[in-house]
Amino acid sequence: MVVLGDPQTYVKNTFSQPIFELMTAWTAAHKDALKIKAVLCTGDLVERNDTPTAFAQFRGDANGNAPSFAQWEFVARAFSRLDGEIPYVLCTGNHDYGYESSENRQTRFGDYF
């Protein structure tokens, strides 16, 4: 089993996204040689589930994070490399839910997976 933890670290910035894409591509390419039976992602797929302002939603934020919809699209595309190749389980983390408080437990996970 391959365990991928906290992909948000790679997903949040467009310059680091190729690193995570290499991880999923490498896993798929080596499934037979390494007898990989499953992949587990321990959560925090994205840095921010949903960005609170319209400006940040489409332009990213002051910290260099990509817009939330772009983070979700990227992580879904990266995991799609495993579709039909290796079964995988994705756990959601706190970053995959509401933006600032536990009162908002909405997630966009179901929109992409």
Model-derived regions, located:
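N-terminal active-site segment of His-dependent metallophosphoesterases
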Residues: M1-A66
